[in-house]
Design a protein with these regions (language model features):
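Beta-rich carbohydrate-recognition and catalytic domains
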Residues: 1-52, 57-107, 120-175, 190-194, ...
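Beta-propeller and closely related beta-sheet repeat lectin domains
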Residues: 48-54, 112-115, 180-183
Length: 234
């Protein structure tokens, strides 16, 4: 199954609609679209910037979906949904950060491409949940966050909808100017415990006019090489 966001923008009014969709395939050549979309619109309190689903199976056997959203007050967040059959979804609410002292309450104007991955800290041996997001609207600093839109990692432990232990600190996933929108791929620990957790991203960003690669190399947008993820020291 391939999960994606269906985006429609009215050419006359400019109004946007976003739906969460799935297609299925047995051979990765022929695809069948699930109609209607599994999530037809965003919940109350959010704009139509509602996209980028990540779906995984939880330890209790149910399925969860993580989405990037924009609140009506024009701040970014991540929403969690739950399902028993991958077709009917119930919104659980926003991912919250009870130990971050409000650091992520108004953190950029949109969170794109959220991914949640569990990694074992190589220094402590503890399993940790790592939230990877691309928060639009973060100001560049003297050193770092100089990408058009940065990609960051927040470390904690997901309990329900709370990412506990995340204290407000975060790290850039990549410090270059041509990295965005990564997707994480991992085998289940039970099926292949030694398999690496891989990350692919865009080598490029949203607008052609802002890309250094246009003038220097005559290209824009491609995938990065795969990267194996590790966590050391939280």
């Amino acid at each position: 199954e391939l999960w994606y966001t269906g985006n429609y923008k009215d050419p006359e009014t400019g109004e946007r609609e976003a739906t969460q969709c799935v297609v299925t395939s047995t051979d990765m050549e022929h695809f069948k679209k699930q109609v209607p979309p599994v999530i037809a619109r965003q919940p109350e309190g959010y704009t139509a910037h509602f996209r980028d689903p990540q779906v995984w199976r939880d330890v209790d056997g149910s399925y969860r979906m993580l989405l990037g959203v924009q609140r009506e007050n024009l701040t970014g967040a991540a929403l969690l949904y739950r399902s028993s059959d991958l077709r009917t979804w119930e919104c659980e609410g926003e991912m919250t950060f009870p130990d971050a002292d409000g650091a992520f309450d108004a953190f950029g104007y949109m969170w794109e491409c959220p991914n949640l991955v569990r990694l074992v800290d190589e220094e402590t041996g503890e399993a940790r949940d790592v939230l990877i997001i691309c928060p639009q609207g973060i100001s560049p600093e003297r050193e770092g966050f100089e990408n058009v839109f940065p990609c960051i990692a927040i470390v904690g432990e997901l309990v329900g909808t709370e990412l506990r232990g995340a204290d407000g600190s975060f790290e850039e996933v990549d410090r270059g100017t041509e990295f965005y929108a990564p997707q994480v791929m991992a085998r289940s620990a039970s099926s292949d415990p030694g398999a690496p957790t891989l990350l692919f991203g865009w080598a490029g960003n949203a607008g052609e006019d802002d890309q250094p690669s246009i003038e220097t190399g005559g290209w824009v947008h491609c995938f990065t090489a795969p990267r194996a993820l590790t966590l050391r020291g939280g």
